[in-house]
Amino acid sequence: MEARQLLEALHVAERLKDETRHCTTTKGTPENVASHSWRMALMAYFMTDEFPELDMNKVIKMCLIHDLGECFTGDIPTFRKTQADEDREASLLSNWVRSLPDPYASDMTALYAEMDALSSQEAKLYKSIDKLEAVIQHNESPISTWEPHEYELNRTYATDIVQFSDYLKVLRAEILKDTNDKIAAGK
């Protein structure tokens, strides 16, 4: 990628640093989309030994690019996002991706198709990490920031997507333990 094209792409991606998400950090700072994606990529890296048969570089790429559409639409929590919101985000993202030079445009287009269809183990792992990281972050945020429906959501979110992996099922159980401990402590 030429230097100017790289800078232009980074200027778009920088918007995610300002795009706040629904919850906060441990100290009450609003979480942003960039930090969510970064920690997802870190999770994938730390899981490399657990998934030796997978292309973990692909999973890390998926984690890094998965929310780029929110550069154009902002973050809408999953429990509020409508199909119209998803369609608008997909359209704006697709237009931007097509403006990138190859091989990035074609690589990202293929990755997004794979991610949307959950057509590979890598895509299933990325999606599991996406959901698990959100629950972990909620567990780390002050319970005073939780909405009433999140008490049950934190107990159940991502239990379906992790079923393909024994490791992820164990991780989800550990996260559930943290959720239940947090609720019991009221913090």
PLM segments and residue spans:
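Alpha-helical, largely C-terminal catalytic domains
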Residues: 1-187
